[in-house]
UniProtKB/Swiss-Prot annotation:
Gene coding for it: pepA
Name the UniProt record assigns to this protein: Probable cytosol aminopeptidase
Keyword Nucleus annotated: no
Key words of the record: Aminopeptidase, Cytoplasm, Hydrolase, Manganese, Metal-binding, Protease
TM regions (residue ranges): none
Required co-factors: Mn(2+)
Parts forming coiled coils: none
Organism field: Corynebacterium diphtheriae (strain ATCC 700971 / NCTC 13129 / Biotype gravis)
Pfam families reported in the protein's UniProt record: Peptidase_M17 (PF00883), Peptidase_M17_N (PF02789)
Amino acid sequence: MSAQFSLPATGLATQLELSKKLPEDIDALVVPTFKGEDGLELAASGLFDENLEIAIWDLLVAVGATGKQGEVVRIPSIEGIEVDFIVGVGLGDNDSLDDDTLRRAAGDAARSLAGVQHVATTLGAFGLQPAVEGFALGAYNYTGVRSKQKKPLPLEKVTFISLGDKKAAKEEFTVGQIIAESVALCRDLVNAPSSHLYPESYAAIIRDTAEKIGLGVEILDEKKLEKQGFGGILAVGTGSSRKPRLVRLTWAPKKAKKSIALVGKGITFDTGGISLKPGAGMDDMISDMGGSATMVATIIAAARLGVKLNVTATIPLAENMPGGNAFRPGDVITHYGGITSEILNTDAEGRLVLADAIARASEDKPDYLLNVATLTGAQIVALGDRTSGVMGSDEFRDSVALTGRTVGEPAWAMPLPEEIGEDVKSPVADIRNVTGSRSGGMMAAGWYLSHFVGEGIEWAHVDIAGPAYNKAGVYGYIPKRATGVPVRTFVQVLSNLAEQ
């Protein structure tokens, strides 16, 4: 019997429901406000008569509400509205309102309501799906592994008021809920400490989660990896007592016409290996499996949403540790498929496990291959903490980057210059895992991975070294620590491909 593992803590506890009327016994009502040319504007809710709407507006104005983006103003309730208090959430200029502005506002509102039991909101009138996502993800509260629950607890329940078509509202609500839950799963996995999440336990958690929704699951242990020649994964994982794994997930709906392979880096902890990282900030390396968590969440979301696309996810899992058996600078390894690589720096390990996984995924001959990783510090230097770098086949690369910006997960297309590709070549092997230059590190990693993509496959590589893990303050619906970026981007990419 296989060992049983589970995540030590999760962060999404808020209940979501849809209603056509204001429920009884709610604590608060959240309403949208706008910044108009002449001051505060209050969107009519359709729940109350004009006099009550004006009374709400009067009180909001009296306390200085402006309707600007990011504003959250709490006022006492008024006679005739059976709630304890009312919250006005600023959406800015009505003419420039977009989904992510709404999503951020809902996240701001949810965070301000921590500890409240039950609220209702009319924010969904301007976009039910982004309102649902924003509230759920803004309320996300990962308290960690504690002997006693940390207070205040997150917002307990949100009722979304929808006065429109019931069927359409239900569909939009469900999509938002599934996507929010998938992002939360990604966050939970990334937030889990490496003492609890390591290759064996992680593979088991993926298996148990995936099997519940009917995905196909295959797990290769270290013996099968060695037998099949996964030299990159084995090299990285050999220094740890916690041996590597490779997980394969499959979603194969009927009548799907196209296929995509997903690959995500799963380094459950990265010390840098023999090329040891500095001690300061090394604890953040629990997040070095953010790419794998993204792809697990993405394929699960695709299955739950019924996306008509054949999807496989190939997830390499390893822990990069120094030790008597660890791989060394100067080693030459043979990847799955036969390409050899000179190791110049053991802290450039992510591309080694990805290379094996990409080569294996390419054997399935998918139409598209999408891989993601917290891969290079160079991504943060070039694009900052919130914008992902996207490389690969021109058309698919640009499509992925545009989709990210469209859904509110900033991404930017990056080139793969020929001269950097030349620098990836090795004098003693086919390629080397770093170049001799500090320049263009993000693109050098992209070039390295390109050698393993099968011929004729449209490919995109997304570097999320900064965006996957928020070390600064909370903003909108983004908490500290794991962000869940870019799950929403990838779910939309898959949906777009299925509809083509």
